[in-house]
Amino acid sequence: MQFARRLHLFAIIFVVIISVDISRAQEANKITINWDKTVKVSKTNATLQVVVNPPLRRGTPVHDNAYAAVRDLQADFVRYVPWLPYPKLGVAELEPPKDGKTFWDFTLIDPMTIDFLEATKGHSVILNFSTIPQWMFKDDKPATYPDDPNLAVWTYEHGHELRDPSGKEVADYFARILSWYTQGGFTDELGKRHDSGHHFSIPYWEVLNEPELEHQVDAEMYTRIYDEAVTAMHKVSPQTKFLGVSLAYPSNNPHFFEYFLDAKNHKLGVPLDYISYHFYAIPSNDETAENQQFSFFAQAEGFLNTVRFIEAIRLRLSPNTGTMVNEIGAISADDLVQGDPGHVTKPIPGSYWNLAGAMYAYIFSELTHIGIDVAGESQLVGYPTQFPSVSMVDWENGKPNPRFWVLKLLHDNFGPGDKLVDTQFVRGYVYASAVITRDGKKRVLLINKRDRPFEINVPGASGGQQSYVDGSTGFQPPASSKLASDKISLAGFSVSVVTLP
């Protein structure tokens, strides 16, 4: 009898414990949202960068689909970067003036640039012709480049010291490019007129790209070039605004920001409209695909701390200057050895694209809370030998991959003017951020940081809609479904937007 009573008592205690555990688990999966408490108003634009490379030339299998995706996105602040591996596609004056003539040539550059400007018509763009002609540097080696414009060359740039240390020669080069696209042409160094017929609006121009890597330009030299370039380009296009800094590794060089953002280091009247910098998650050589979900988000956390630190510098020295983080992505360890002889690109698992997309979504959302102006995903097209792991489209046909579809999901559902409201959620593997959009809709962004499913309870979601990108959507657009309850299912690396009824 006594045994039976004890057994009954233990059974009751067990049921109570289990009930409490279940209740706690349910509570742990429940998001608490205070829709009446606005913590910040977003000013962040989700966008991307388009890097010039041969697959984007007319007539390729990639060109039409890739630019159709850009056109359909309808994003602002799209960044366009002709850069160093393809001198004939990115440098407009490959040889110095000689024997009474100059060597300006936009024959190959124009079609690609015009296609970009047409695909982004009606929206703001950022141009960055990032590569300074090699002959403008003091160097014993002559500038060499392949005859084939499609052949990548990583040895075009060398040398550190400009042959014109004032930076005026470089500034005039950039001013003439800007004039080519905005003023119908320019007058060259020898007084000859070159007509283009172009009268595009170029609202933003970024001065150089990752200067600490390209020619190892320090803060002092960069600021000198920036001041000369902006002064010359403002005369051509007074309405154009400018981006400066553009560091690849912002956490390594706080002095660069301290120096550049201090007005006393600039010529009087030179505007400091925006600063920019970049972030890529990069796994170690021996890191497995399964482990990347941990390291990518850990690296993202470190970068966000860097952003907060830089913002403190900016607010102290130049509070009216904006900030654009205009390259956000991931680079595989394999891509870092793509230039090795005989290198063969390793297959990229499908889950990688979803992981990289989820990481971008997380950084984008956190940048809205910090108050950053632009969060630009990188990059439209990559392909074997040219950072394939960074691509946002299939390099065989130009159709968007999950990274692009995550960007579109974010762009179509969130933007400047959204009210970010108080959101509490204890589960660290799933990120949640609730907003009231400019048109009054209540939305919750959910990001699964892990390659395994979770169920989350969003109060009031029943009758609403869930739009998402995950492994099940593949290379297709975001999927949508009506919600029958407050319970939200998240597949591995899911990026989901829940719109309340």
Residue map of PLM features:
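Glycoside hydrolase catalytic-domain groove-lining segments
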Residues: 282-339, 398-399
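C-terminal beta-strand-rich structural cap/linker in extracellular carbohydrate-active enzymes
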Residues: 479-501
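Mature N-terminal, pre-catalytic/accessory segment of carbohydrate-active enzymes
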Residues: 25-76
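Carbohydrate-binding surface patches
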Residues: 426-462, 469-471, 493-497
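Aromatic/acidic polysaccharide-binding cleft in carbohydrate-active enzymes
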Residues: 325-414, 418-431
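Short, acidic/polar
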Residues: 56-70, 254-265, 357-364
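Bacterial N-terminal signal peptides
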Residues: 8-19
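Substrate-binding cleft and catalytic face of glycoside hydrolase catalytic domains
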Residues: 73-296
